[in-house]
Each structure stands twice: as structure tokens, then as C-alpha cells.
Regions:
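Conserved acidic carboxylate
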Residues: 10
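Two-component/phosphorelay signaling modules centered on CheY-like receiver
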Residues: 13-32, 37
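Acidic, metal-coordinating helix/loop segments flanking the phosphotransfer/catalytic sites
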Residues: 20, 33-52
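Active-site residues of response regulator receiver
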Residues: 56-57, 84
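Short amphipathic alpha-helix used as the core "switch/output" element in two-component signaling
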Residues: 64-78
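A short, hydrophobic beta-strand element within the central beta-sheet of small alpha/beta folds
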Residues: 77-87
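Alpha4 helix (beta4-alpha4-beta5 surface) of REC/receiver domains from two-component response regulators
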Residues: 87-105
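C-terminal output helix
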Residues: 90, 108-118
Length: 123
């Protein structure tokens, strides 16, 4: 059986590495992380879309995580889980418009991450 693939879109390198380690140890195939929405979209044009995207809401660059998630969902119908360090009601309302599979608050706890990923992939 092939491991399900996950793309991490996170502009903080240490957080991306932490997520990669947790997910790889749980048996998921983690694609090389990208640090911006633009990178994520370019990456997805070149490869088979992953089974899941973990996306930081606040990314550097011209596309924030919410707009990037909107484009990913429209093009590829891939489930997205948002990562956030903030609970700003305006940002959360915007994020809800793209129907994410969940939100994980930073700092990310292993149990919380794996529960959200499992739910997004298997209902």
C-alpha cells in the first residue's frame, strides 16, 4: 500500500521540519515543503497533487494561505488543513470561506496534528 502524500506550505523552516518529522514517523509520504503560496501552486503544476495540504494561513509573498488554499481547492479538490498562530475572527471568517478540513493552532502538538490529518484523509 502506498503511503498517503502530504504537502506542507509553511514559511517557518523549523515548524516545517517538525511537521515533516511527525508525519513521516506516522507513515505518511511528506513532499518537500514549500514556503509560499506561489511556490505551492508552481509545485502542484509539476507533480501529482498530494492527498492533503497543510497550509499556514499567514504566508510571505503575494498570496496568503487562504487565497492559496482557494486556488488549490478550485484546481485540484485537495483537502486543506490550516495552521495558524492567531485566532483573529476576521482571518478565521475568511479562512472558513474555502471550507478547510480543520485548523491547527501553533505550536503544533503531535496528537492534535495526527488526529486532524487522519480525519481529513479518512473522514
Amino acid at each position: 500500500m502506498n503511503a498517503q502524500s502530504i504537502l506542507i506550505v509553511e514559511d517557518e523552516g523549523l515548524i516545517a521540519l517538525h511537521l515533516m518529522e511527525i508525519l513521516a514517523n506516522a507513515g505518511y509520504r511528506v513532499l518537500d515543503p514549500v514556503a509560499s503560496g506561489e511556490e505551492a501552486l508552481r509545485h502542484l503544476e509539476k507533480v501529482t497533487p498530494p492527498d492533503l495540504v497543510l497550509m499556514d494561513i499567514t504566508l510571505d509573498g503575494s498570496l496568503d494561505g487562504i487565497e492559496t488554499a482557494r486556488q488549490i481547492r478550485n484546481r485540484y479538490m485537495v483537502p486543506v488543513i490550516f495552521l495558524t498562530a492567531h485566532s483573529n475572527s476576521h482571518i478565521m471568517a475568511r479562512a472558513q470561506e474555502v471550507s478547510p478540513c480543520g485548523y491547527i493552532v501553533k505550536p503544533v502538538m503531535e496528537k492534535d496534528l495526527l488526529e486532524h490529518v487522519e480525519k481529513a484523509l479518512h473522514g
